[in-house]
């Protein structure tokens, strides 16, 4: 019934007035029912009841039709016009009571539908209202000044009290706390934050007062981007919703064209009286009205988008959410998408006979790596630091050799395997095995003799493996794209469980692989997080950016997962499938109701009151069916 594009101006401008007038009209209608034989007074009261209760419906029927016709330069009637004409026609026949009843039922359903459709909109508004407005700025003299968030500049320092909202994106420079980041990524478990850790605007400071240095303008924060994406998503309708919107004026025009044929046919072919034939035409206007059909897609789509936004998955439009269920292939960038994005120690080994010295040697290894800023060194330190004692070492980083230190005339060296000439057989065999598993190996030597190794790998994250398993269960072909060597790429691919791996891929080649998948498999999605993923994200039917990724990847993608958790993309796929199923249910149900009412009208069974009651009831059923998507999908 409702015009989905927001023609309900009565909601925005004095939204209580239509409700007050509706109940005034309802009261007049009931007064008229009890006036007995005072026919003139009754008809006046019924007419006033219809005008007061349905003035906004009449206005939208004639006013919007005139405006849309003028803008489109062709006749563009709407559903409200059908109801208005049916009410006017009924009054012209002298059935003022039935005319008023039609408008009252239609208006009552109108308010219920607006409320129901507004529920998904209100859920989105709740999210947008989380946007912080004020901040406690620390001035140059150390005093605290409350300012609007828009006044903050990069480099400013702000104080965030216990239990307060963090006003903007920044980095902690004083204090420690636990932050609830559910407004950003949908995760309810607070994250520990210490000096140097990033924080995001709109999140809630939990357990301690902190000082944050502003790192982004208020318009560029993560939450500001979320607001932008959510607003954009409401404007971009699903394909089926767009088709229904375009179809509505054509359908209503057809109904209006059929109306005189029914009136003439009833009188000339079926020997009905002109009054009865005209009445059947009026019932047809109501029965054929596509109210429920018009509400089949938009409320459901907004509900799905709202649900996913609360889970930290942002769609830039309803069309992308609807299309996700149709994807036949998904291509994944490896680093940071399927893997954690940072190397971790997976294995370490010392040659036989050094069991008693293992703790000592691990301590030397760890303290040597502390002197390096290489990612592999960081991974080794993270793995062993808690288990070792600190040593004061002089470490030299020699190009082509590695890290070298001397302790009491004993020289220790850490380097890549190719920098060592002689290697024990056990180390050599393990190196071959570990390399076949896609792991990077570094050697540890004492006095030029290799005595151990450490293997590292950018390991797959568990959420990614579970997500790949889910997508494969949905018959979606999964592909991993990586710039790594073939051996490493295929090893990671086996661990994650993807169907195929493209290794040694240059950034500019990723888009060509997406083209290949589109040609061979069908609708293809691309999931990535880096600048080099941007061309492929744009080229894919659906581009998905992981939230820890670069701004350019997020800007060009159609979907943003605010946390690097692919299980959330799997959840979005389930919501998409459920959305399409609900929309199909709504369309079939609404068409069956229209067909049933038209048949009952031709059989002479349906009257105006019955038709409008069933018709508006079916519209409410369709809307509430769509609102089920506000509830989490299993």
Where are these regions (language model features)?
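Conserved ATP-binding TGD loop and adjacent catalytic N/P-domain core of P-type ATPases
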Residues: 409, 452-585
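Hydrophobic alpha-helical transmembrane segments
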Residues: 43-67, 101-114, 119-126, 238-332, ...
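P-type ATPase nucleotide-binding
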Residues: 350-474, 500
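A short beta-strand structural signal in non-transmembrane regions
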Residues: 210-216, 442, 479, 552, ...
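Actuator/coupling domain of P-type ATPases
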Residues: 2-3, 33, 46-132, 157, ...
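Membrane-embedded alpha-helical bundles of multi-pass transporters
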Residues: 2-16, 29-35, 60-66, 70, ...
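Conserved cytosolic catalytic loops of P-type ATPases
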Residues: 126-212, 216-217, 319-365, 406
